[in-house]
Amino acid sequence: MKLCIFTRFLRQIINKQSKTKIEPMAHLSDIEIAQAKKLEHIIKIAQKLGVDEDDIEMYGKYKAKLPLHLIDDDKVAKNNLVLVTALTPTPAGEGKTTVSIGLTEGLNKIGKQATVVLREPSLGPVFGIKGGAAGGGYSQVVPMEDINLHFTGDFNAVEKANNLLSALIDNNIQNKTNNLNIDPRTILWKRVIDMNDRALRDITIGLGGTANGVPRQDGFNITPASEVMAILCMATDFDNLKKRLGDIFIGFTYQNEPVFARDLKAENAMAILLKDAVKPNLVQTLEENPAIIHGGPFANIAQGTNTILATKMGLTLSNYVVTEAGFGADLGAEKFLNIKSAFAKLNPKCVVLVATIRALRHHGGVQKEAYNTPNLDAVSDGFKNLEKHIENIRKFNIEPVVAINSFISDSDEEVNFVIEKCNSLGVHAVLSEGWAKGGEGTKELAKAVVDIVENKATQYKPLYDWKSPVTEKIETIAKEVYGAENVEYSKQAQLNLRRINRLGFNDFAICMAKTQKSFSDNEQLIGRPEGFTVTVREIEIAAGAQFLIPILGKMMRMPGLPESPASEGMTIDKNGVISGLS
């Protein structure tokens, strides 16, 4: 209780600040702020959306599932979708989730009915380097610990459905009387686990004798990279989910015939495991506004957006939906606009580009140890990265707003420089102080977004037609979005292209797997590199999700932990109170 009173007192002080710099919040951590909040019962949050108690499936007092029958496509088309993305980030991230939540609070404060719709966090980054995905400071979704950990079990369901298919594949190979004659050397399907564990990237299974299966090479991806996760995020209803699960491409028989999950009669059992996971999750922000959180693919190795069902649920129940797409705009936003919006017929009316002075210093050549030292020259040099992202958003026929996510180390000169440079490009740039002030710190950003949505919004357009040739789609992204001069294809990628053509998958969307640290496929090329060539190493097939995954450079779909993982700083006491989670 004392902490709660102190937190509210401290917040009142912070809300009176009007300077560019944000003063320290007495070292209160994100989790301490979240734990000090007295949450509203989830029934009251649902009522704010016009949803009756009988229409929600409660997971305790503060979490609930929303049934799919609530979705109304007529309302989806009428309401306003705002996408939050960012410039090319530093390893710690630039605060897209924090800005998304803060913007939602700000929109509600200026009289707009707004809901934030986000992805679910993965345990890999939570215990790794990047931390959770519940926002920060006074712009968080709660209950923060639950959301960042097991939440409502959706990730577990995705993992189990994925690994059920793996078990069915190996069982079929082992079965001597009733098998599909699958050639183990051609199996493309991998197991998954929601953890950063590099030791599982390449493994051998089936050892220990004939009773333990047929030995073969296998490996693990992280759960957000699972095609089951991609399917969950692309499904339009439960029947569509089941069909997509059946369409998963596994490999070939010894007769070189393709094998799909439906050939193993796997889709119904997989769908059974996902029967609850398909429903979006309802929670709340610190200011008791609705938050829908559902699905969790990464943007560098998957499509990086929440589910179509969650976005449509939000647009059914609110006039404004604020959503985000992972990493920089070259990854998450590109996929949101070329894949998700194109397929689901969504029309985002504004894009908020999150920038930080820290990231601009980084792209100006500053080393990590000097990220927090004012350096106007570096910010000036690094601005070209932000400028390229602005140009890219405009290629989709959408007008961006730049949100400068404020840090205590920002100088007035640096902030004013960025605002003036954006203004010279005809872009409205606004200081976003949601981390320190919640909705009070984002009202100006909210007004800038509303101005675009209500006065300047146009019909967005994707950069490519899904029916275009595969190489043309890849090269459109590489050249138009990344700024590459050339695209090269390895021998493996060329073999993959022939396989794709033979299987009739040419009309699928393109979901690039690329480093998030650069526009290029070389993470060392910061800023705005030019004249570079990207190399397509291989192209994976996600037939159920209906996209192809060109893997650029050295990207891997199972991350590893850093030398000092975040888990080392976490504790839990005898009463179950967690600290160190962020």
Cite the ranges covered by each PLM segment.
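Charged/polar low-complexity intrinsically disordered segments
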Residues: 9-12, 19-21, 576
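Intrinsically disordered, low-complexity serine/threonine-rich segments
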Residues: 14-18, 194-195
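Generic secretory/membrane-interface signal
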Residues: 9-15, 114, 318
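Flexible phosphate-sensing "switch/lid" loops adjacent to ATP/NTP-binding sites
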Residues: 22-582
